[in-house]
Amino acid sequence: MLNIQFLFAKKAKKSYTVVNKLNKQENKMKKYKLQATASFGLEAVVKREIENLGFENISVSDGYVEFTSDLRGIAKANLWLRSADKVLMIIGRFQAVTYEELFDNSYALPWDELIPKDANFIITGKSFKSTLSSVPACQSIVEKAIIKKLQTKYAISHFPKTGVEYTIQAALLKNTVTITLNTSGPSLHKRGYRHGQVIAPLKETMAAGLIQLSYWKKDRIFLDPCCGSGTLPIEAALIGRNIAPGLSRKFAAELWDFIPKEVWQDERKAAYSAIDYDAELTIYGSDINAHPVEIAKQNAENAGVDDSIVFR
């Protein structure tokens, strides 16, 4: 019997149980397991953000925080998480010590309900303290399992991969395999406002995490005397005005068929409505060199918070 946990539920004909079956008419309110990855040391901050967004069944591990949500939560998490790196959708989790087990369990997942026949699906992988230590081999096995599953549904032998991108990760940890879909696309630190940068810039997600660790409040002065390209002051302004950090960018899952377009439209509309345009902020940024300050001013303008920060 396959010892496997699925994200999508239905009663299977075989001896395993699936957790949730995707259905375009019914899947909006179903619960899905999500994983927000984070830089080491920021897990507690990400957990706090997830709690504040109202998500449930939260658990913390090194490098990530897991929680449950409906499909709407995928959009909400991507738009609002400030310190997380990516939001992954957990498709399955199982034990595997042989390539046969890896193939069988990967094949059993509901790829035919997730991936269209023209999908450009990319397999990534990592392995730590696992019997199956060859990452390229694991990637190949998972890809073969997915192709075989899709061949069964679409009755074609060749997949052109000319459509929407689906990045699938097979992560092995102590012989436990977690298969995920990357709903974010590029890392969430890519907010879209940084068009200019300096040497060794601070990642936006790290900056947001540091600000939240400081427990800064918007009614207090914020001063960054070494602001560089302005990441810390800009992130503080976004927090102070309650601006969702992902409003100015797109996400991989926005193009996926099984997530209704109105989910993203509704969550973006709600995020815009939540902005506090009247917040009175006292934020300063300065640097020993004039060039980074000019870059910081432009980045702040791109982020829509240039009227909230004084750069000198």
List PLM regions with ranges.
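S-adenosyl-L-methionine
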Residues: Y32-L42, V46-R48, T68-R82, L172-K217, ...
